[in-house]
């Protein structure tokens, strides 16, 4: 059995005497597993390189992942039963709590669970542009998948999530990461989806 404790490391907390939550926690079952097996530290990519969930898992299971790298969106899409066709773009999403200025209050919306399905249903099929079909599905807890179907789409766009460790706490504008018109179009579509989704979800009874 190969146990991956993704994200469990955390950071030291002053209220815990400078310990991380894991160091301060009572973990008898984890301790037992380690005593019966083996544990250690490793640099998944290289010394000093912080990796995300997708990169870390791919590196652990596929030594050739640098040549076979798939972004997280397509993997999340398959996880909820959506299989992509050529030219379609899948994005891994979070339900998040924001204020009226798009300042992020909670990147995971309180780790919402069953209610996420109702929220996702209200966004599925959203009309953001002629010739573009929107598929939106809830995944585990606060996670969701956005699939854009249509012509002239590109995966070469930036993220709207500043991330946990960022000094920025506002939803970021999605920008093209290439000069291709398809990337510019896709970035505009995703920004439009975010704006429309905010208008719909802020009035949602959930």
Per-region residue spans from a language model:
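Conserved structured core elements
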Residues: 2, 23-27, 191
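Beta-sheet entry/capping signal
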Residues: 1, 39, 143-145
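Active-site nucleophile/metal-coordination loop of metallo-enzymes that catalyze phosphate/sulfate
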Residues: 9-125
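A contiguous, mid-domain pocket- or channel-lining segment that forms the substrate-recognition surface
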Residues: 72, 76-200
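Short, flexible coil/turn micro-motifs enriched in small/turn-prone residues
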Residues: 2-4, 43, 158
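Beta-strand elements within well-structured catalytic alpha/beta cores of enzymes
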Residues: 1-11, 33, 193-196, 206
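Aromatic-enriched hydrophobic runs in primary sequence
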Residues: 6, 33-36, 137, 189
């Amino acid at each position: 059995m190969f146990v991956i404790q993704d994200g469990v490391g955390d950071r030291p907390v002053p209220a815990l005497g400078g310990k991380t939550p894991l160091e301060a926690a009572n973990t008898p079952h984890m301790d037992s597993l380690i005593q019966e097996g083996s544990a250690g530290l490793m640099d998944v990519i290289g010394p000093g390189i912080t990796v995300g969930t997708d990169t870390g898992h791919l590196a652990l299971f596929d030594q050739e992942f640098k040549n076979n790298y798939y972004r997280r969106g397509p993997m999340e899409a398959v996880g909820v039963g959506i299989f992509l066709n050529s030219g379609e773009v899948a994005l891994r999403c979070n339900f998040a709590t924001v204020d009226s200025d798009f300042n992020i209050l909670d990147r995971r919306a309180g780790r919402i669970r069953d209610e996420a399905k109702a929220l996702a249903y209200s966004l599925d099929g959203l009309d953001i542009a002629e010739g573009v079909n929107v598929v939106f599905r809830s995944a585990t807890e606060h996670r969701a998948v956005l699939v854009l179907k249509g012509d002239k789409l590109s995966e070469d766009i930036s993220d709207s999530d500043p991330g946990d460790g960022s000094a920025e706490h506002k939803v970021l504008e999605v920008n093209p990461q290439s000069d291709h018109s398809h990337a510019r179009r896709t970035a505009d579509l995703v920004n439009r989806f975010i704006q429309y989704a905010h208008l719909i979800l802020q009035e949602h009874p959930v």
